[in-house]
Amino acid sequence: MSKDFSNWYVIKRDNETLVPFDDKKITKAISNAIKAVNNIDKSTNELTEKTVTDEVLKLLNDHIRYNVSGDVVFSVEEIQNCVEKALVTLGLYEVAKEYITYREKRNQLRMMKSSLMQTYQDFIMNLFLK
């Protein structure tokens, strides 16, 4: 799908940072999930990546909303949800399972890092306040 994404942005998990939308990141995530499921030949993998990426872009296009500047903005979660939906819609259930599992592991890791940072900050504050 050839599309101009120059006014598409992704709001990062900090809910402040806007970065340019990059459909190649979607393709890479799909590719990683496919590779984790099985070792298929490169041409089949690339065809599947393109098909799924195109489906994700269609789903995103159906959910476009504009910010005050007239730019299209999606959250990371919205994009990931569309990837999951595209994988299931296209019948790639094992790939969807791998993608969802990886996504959940990353979420748990982020939560652990956040908890660890909070513990560290509390420790430092207690150390200097005593």
Where are these regions (language model features)?
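Extended catalytic cores of very large enzyme megasubunits
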Residues: M1-K130
